[in-house]
C-alpha cells in the first residue's frame, strides 16, 4: 500500500532582509527531499504549501523557519492519496498575499482571533456581520451560512469593497474568514488601520475549522476551494469527489 502524501501549508509575517538569497537554498533542500509545491518569499514573510512524505515536509519547514528567522508560524497539515502539486516552485514576490495596500503593518494592526470551537457561537450572535474574504469562484462551491459575498475576482479588489461598504460595516462586530487564515491577517489589519475596532477572524481559516469541529452544526455549506490539483476538499479535508484537476 502506498504511503499517503502529506500536504503542509505554512505562513509567517516576518521581516526578511534579502528574500531572493533564500531561493537557491530552499530549492536545494526541497528537491533533495522530493518536495512539490510553492513557496512564496517577500520582505514581509513567506507563504507556502507543499507536499511529500511527512518526514520530508517537516524537514523543509524547519529549514524555512531557520532561514527566515520566524518565531510565529501558522502551520496546517492534511493528507492526499497522491501529490496535489506538479513540481516545486520558490518565487520572489512583493507581497506573500497580494492586496496592494502600501505600508500595512499586520503586527501593529491585527484583528482578534476566534478559535474554531467558538466560531459557530460567535457568528450567530446579534450585531455580528460575517464576511467571506475569498474570491467569488471560491465562494461559489462553499461558504458559511449567511456570509456576505463581496463578489471579488481577486483579493486586490477587497479594499475597494470595504471603502464602498462603510455604511454596512459601521457599528458592527465584523467577523471574517478565508481558506487558511493568511488573507484575514491582512483584511483585519486593513479594517483596524482605518478605524474599525471590533474586527475578528477565524483562527486557522476554514481548513482548521473543519479539522477541529467537523462542521458539527452544519453552518459551513458546500466544499472548500484549495489552490492545488485537488481544487476542493470536503468536510473531512480529503479531496472532494469530482473536483480533482487531471493533467
UniProtKB/Swiss-Prot annotation:
Belongs to the TrhO family. Residues 124-218 form the Rhodanese domain. The active site is at residue 178. The keyword Electron transport does not apply. This is tRNA uridine(34) hydroxylase. Its EC number is 1.14.-.-. GO terms for molecular function: oxidoreductase activity, acting on paired donors, with incorporation or reduction of molecular oxygen. It catalyses: uridine(34) in tRNA + AH2 + O2 = 5-hydroxyuridine(34) in tRNA + A + H2O. It comes from the Bacteria. One of its GO terms (biological process) is tRNA modification.
